[in-house]
């Protein structure tokens, strides 16, 4: 985010928290004060990451309470509609640039959703460069490439064209 802010000659306030669910992202933005000319860039999380009773988790978690949640309470259709509602809600109040972690998540969105997502994916930049010494994270060049691509998408208003389908 700071690389992009530098490129756009803006100051940067990064309020992200790794592992946040889309519900938590929505709550953080809604409870923060924003100026009318603020540039808000939202990196939405994985569709199935959720927050329940104040705890964050993903479907892949092996804890018993998490498995119970996904077995008994979770519905991918309901979750996609909830996500679309949160994105549209924020975008109806603020001018936002939306980013999605995975293009497959965009194919699951509700047909009534009006918000757009920039046509840039982190995974595309990540694939172009080797991993850092830890073997898990990409090297700095991947971040620079992503910031440059993101900047071009904002300047050119390049949004992902969703192949809509009913969910």
Regions found by a protein language model. Give the residues of each.
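Serine-esterase "nucleophile elbow" of acetyl-processing enzymes
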Residues: 1-23, 33-34, 145, 153
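Short active-site-adjacent helix-start/loop capping segments
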Residues: 21-25, 48-51
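Alpha-helical cap/lid subdomain in secreted, periplasmic
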Residues: 30-167
